[in-house]
Amino acid sequence: LICLSGKKITYDSLVVCPGIQLDWNKIEGLKDNLGKNDVSCNYSYESAPYTWEMIKNMKKGTAVFTNPSSPIKCGGAPHKIMYLACDYWQKQGVLDQIKVHYVSGAGVIFGVKEYAETLKGMLEKYKIITHFQSDTYKIDGEGKTLYFRTKLNKDQLAENFKSSN
C-alpha cells in the first residue's frame, strides 16, 4: 500500500473477491493476472486451486485478502479463506512471519452483529490489519502491486506483494 502520505506496506500474495457478477474487468489488471503473479480468486473455478497453492507455499511476507463493497455471492467467503490461511500458517509455525491485511469495502467486519463479535476476535487472534471502506481498483501483477481507494480519508493506496518465500 502506498498512502498519499508516502507510507508503504507490502504483501506477497493477494486473493481478490471482485463481486457477485464476476466482472473480472471491474478491477483493472485482474483478468490478466488471475491465476498467476500471486493473484487468485476463489470465485474462479480455474484459479481457486491456485489460492491454496499460494497459501501452502507462503512462509513469510504479506498476504492481502479483499472483499468488495458491491454485493457478493457469499458474504463469508472472503473471511473463510483468510481465516483458513491464517490457521494453516499458524499450524505451520509461520504466521508470525506473515503480515495479513484485509481490504474491505464494508464499514465493519461483518454485517450481522452476533457474528461480528466473534470475527473481531479472529482478527485479533491472527493480528490481521484491516482497511475498511476500501475498494480495490487496480492490480499490477508483474509489478506485484494492488491499488485501492478508501472512503474514510480518500487516500489512494497501493500494496506491493513481491514474493519472499
Show where each model-derived region lies.
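A Rossmann-like FAD-binding core segment of flavoenzymes
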Residues: 1-2, 90-165
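Glycine-centered loop/turn positions within well-structured domains
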Residues: 9, 22, 61, 137, ...
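Short hydrophobic core segments
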Residues: 10-21, 159-165
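Rossmann-like dinucleotide/flavin-binding elements
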Residues: 23-110, 159, 165
